[in-house]
Amino acid sequence: MNKKSIRDVDLKGKRVFCRVDFNVPMKEGKITDETRIRAALPTIQYLIEQGAKVILASHLGRPKGQAVEELRLTPVAARLGELLGKDVKKADEAFGPVAQEMVAAMNEGDVLVLENVRFYAGEEKNDAELAKEFAALADIFVNDAFGAAHRAHASTAGIADYLPAVSGLLMEKELDVLGKALSNPERPFTAIIGGAKVKDKIGVIRHLLDKVDNLIIGGGLAYTFVKALGHEIGLSLCENDKIELAKEFMQLAKEKGVNFYMPVDVVITEEFSETATTQIVGIDSIPSTWEGVDIGPKTREIYADVIKNSKLVVWNGPMGVFEMTPFAEGTKAVGQALADAEDTYSVIGGGDSAAAVEKFGMADKMSHISTGGGASLEFMEGKELPGVVCLNDK
């Protein structure tokens, strides 16, 4: 990575405005999944050890520019204190006199959590005045929020106009792993692209067709490709306006010598529920009143075989509606194949794929699970991320 990180700067006694991604799911004021808080710990601990005054900023939910009581970061600050085993202070504002006073009272190694930055309308507009207010609290800006790196907001990008800007350890790791995967991959390199919609994955499929040896397609978006081959797909998800594009992608794969894998059999159902009756049919035999909801057993075997023989696999998007038990087997099988593949470096591209490997208890068997759904997708599309571009070069 050619951007400076916290390892490249002197932090002792410095006030550090560290943008983290503490956007954790909450239920009735309780955190239901603290993965993102834990992911930020190495950076926070490093800052503490180096004698910095650690000022943490994050968003939580979508308060739309106003204070929303249940989206305050108070429970997050409390949990962070428990995880760090030290007193963590919480400010009720993200800038201004109250925050400045609390920062002025900090000693080296102290940790302060600012209020939800999205309580202020200027945050998502990347307002220069708000960015200046944030910058006034600190000497150095650290961006460790890879999950928000694709956003040009005041606390992720704008603030870098007024302070020296470096990456945290999590951001550095994400950029290293994803960057290496795209610029210098070990081969065979396989991408698994799933999820519901072709339109969400157009950019990533197009970009990866130039990089990969194998492209595996699954999830709801597969049926647009199946229809492009001339098969009937019943009531399965289909984007009719993307059928020509699907044909174009299959043709491109052929021209570039990329092995393009699609389902050969699918799990179908007539109702969308936990107790649904399902059948397994070949891809050319979906009845008109049924819909495809998962990849079938033959497809799972083929995909597992490709995975096993790959050196690098990037996975973005589930193979079926994994949230419901009858439609979860395909996604589980892909996860299992990655967990079992000893010589394969597996990169899970955040979002639903990350949720799936967590759900099936396979997370610790994956080489790298990205903390950014949208950010990792845009990175894999070859786009520049505003929260990265703004950091100082080495």
From Swiss-Prot:
**Gene Ontology cellular-component terms listed:** cytosol
Matches recorded under CDD domains: Phosphoglycerate_kinase
Which Cys pairs does UniProt list as disulfide-bonded? none
Entry's InterPro entries? Phosphoglycerate_kinase (IPR001576), Phosphoglycerate_kinase_CS (IPR015911), Phosphoglycerate_kinase_N (IPR015824), Phosphoglycerate_kinase_sf (IPR036043)
Q: Name one Pfam family in it.
A: PGK
Q: In which pathway does it act?
A: Carbohydrate degradation; glycolysis; pyruvate from D-glyceraldehyde 3-phosphate: step 2/5
Principal location class: cytoplasm
Swiss-Prot/TrEMBL keywords: ATP-binding, Cytoplasm, Glycolysis, Kinase, Nucleotide-binding, Phosphoprotein, Transferase
Q: Which residues carry this modification: Phosphoserine?
A: S183
What Enzyme Commission number(s) apply to this enzyme? 2.7.2.3
GO molecular function of the protein, one example? Answer: phosphoglycerate kinase activity
Q: Where in or outside the cell is it found?
A: Cytoplasm
A GO BP entry is: gluconeogenesis
The record's catalysed reaction(s) read: (2R)-3-phosphoglycerate + ATP = (2R)-3-phospho-glyceroyl phosphate + ADP
- Note the subunit structure: Monomer.
What family is this protein classified in?
A: Belongs to the phosphoglycerate kinase family.
UniProt name for this protein: Phosphoglycerate kinase
Provide the species name.
Bacillus mycoides (strain KBAB4)
Q: What is the lineage of its organism?
A: Bacteria, Bacillati, Bacillota, Bacilli, Bacillales
